[in-house]
């Protein structure tokens, strides 16, 4: 189960002499820190981490990384911060960012963030950080599924397949439907038959299709058991097709 605001990131975007840094975590503020003449990212981040740890906030864990500090807690918390004369030397966020520029260059493995993009529900997407060593440090971001969204279809309630296992022997078994891997219910919705009765199945143009009420749902092209998009950011010709008919009566 996903719980909002249990993680946070403080990203340093620049250092200079006599820059004042302010951070408030869960309503508690560190004493303002002014960077010395030898200020580097490591110096600033180490001092900020020490001061945050000194607040002794229950359940709070901090991790210093290349250009950021990651905070996690076993309960929701608030996070804010400022740095620089024009507040341009620190980015602070929790579960989401507006642009990719706000993300740290490195973070912990499996750190998931929502990119709001233009602000519209259908333009948002989720990224997960994959650390090369499986822990933290150098790595890359890849598109992923919202942590509050189900992975997809329930094979026990979906159509099954009859498999010829040997001469005159058949096995009725569940189909290994491809899990939903990216997006959420707004950007990569369930096919329309979910929650309804499937009345007919068919193949068309290298797709598996299902009829349900006044809708028709077809799989990825050439991938019969995949009813979801592979990206919430782009649309391709091979993506699933889901249509609603204007009437269920023959014309």
Which stretches of residues belong to each language-model region?
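Hydrophobic residues embedded in beta-strands of well-ordered beta-sheets
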Residues: 67-70, 170, 208, 216
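Short alpha-helical segments and helix-capping/turn motifs at coil-helix boundaries
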Residues: 1, 55-58, 62, 108-113, ...
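Extended, well-folded catalytic/binding cores that form a central cleft or groove in large enzyme
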Residues: 1, 5-7
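N-terminal accessory interaction module
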Residues: 44, 48-52, 80-184
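Short, well-ordered alpha-helical packing segments
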Residues: 8-13, 45-49, 53, 97, ...
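Extended, beta-strand-rich, solvent-exposed assembly scaffolds of outer structural proteins
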Residues: 9-81, 108-131, 158-160
């Amino acid at each position: 189960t996903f719980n909002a605001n249990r993680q946070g990131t403080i990203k340093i975007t620049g250092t200079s002499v006599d820059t004042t840094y302010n951070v408030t975590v869960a309503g508690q503020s560190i004493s303002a820190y002014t960077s010395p003449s030898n200020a580097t990212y490591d110096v600033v981040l180490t001092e900020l981490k020490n001061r945050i740890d000194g607040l002794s906030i229950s359940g709070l864990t901090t991790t210093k990384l290349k250009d950021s500090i990651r905070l996690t807690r076993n309960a929701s918390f608030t996070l804010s911060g400022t740095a620089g004369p024009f507040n341009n030397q620190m980015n602070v966020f929790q579960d989401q960012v507006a642009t990719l520029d706000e993300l740290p260059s490195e973070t912990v493995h499996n750190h998931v963030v929502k990119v709001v993009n233009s602000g519209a529900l259908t333009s948002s997407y989720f990224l997960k950080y994959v650390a090369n060593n499986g822990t933290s440090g150098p790595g890359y971001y890849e598109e992923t599924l919202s942590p509050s969204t189900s992975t997809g279809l329930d094979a026990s309630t979906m159509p099954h397949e009859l498999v010829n296992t040997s001469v005159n022997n058949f096995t009725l078994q569940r189909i290994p439907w491809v899990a939903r891997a990216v997006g959420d219910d707004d950007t990569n919705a369930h096919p329309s038959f979910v929650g309804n009765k499937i009345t007919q199945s068919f193949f068309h143009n290298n797709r598996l299709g299902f009829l349900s009420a006044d809708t028709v749902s077809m799989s990825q092209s050439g991938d019969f058991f995949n009813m979801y998009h592979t990206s919430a950011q782009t649309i391709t010709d091979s993506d699933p097709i889901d249509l609603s008919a204007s009437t269920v009566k023959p014309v």
